[in-house]
Amino acid sequence: MSVRRAARIGDAWLIVNTSGLGKVAPLMQTYRAALKEYGRTPMEFPITVECYVGAHYATAHEECRGPLEYKYNAYASWGLQDRSTQGSFEDFARDRFIIGDKVSVKEEIARYRELLGVDHFIMRCQWPGLPQERVLDSIQRLGDIFA
């Protein structure tokens, strides 16, 4: 299993949460068990996640829906991610992306930390079709969370 190999020979396993927390959480348990088995301690536990911080929770999903659907439909057309069997965008995004206002995004980040034990977040905040002004506003709000 690749996460055991990462524990054995890598410095850290970089999680890319495109499969959702339901699949990632058990893999993290396997990874941590393998780290213990191999006597390894990585310097950090990183994760890469799509993130959008809107001004209002009620509109955040709608603001980034088109660009993220475009991106993940492209992945599906390449055979990398099946979107055809998924329900709504909100269902697809749940436990896979961090989207909301400043309060809900901060809560989600805390939930990821608690559930996975991750301590380093690489937030992907820009996608084809998302206007640059929205990208910069989202990044500013993300920074406000931790300022």
Feature map (PLM): residue ranges:
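Active-site-adjacent structural elements that line small-molecule/cofactor binding pockets in enzymes
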Residues: M1-A147
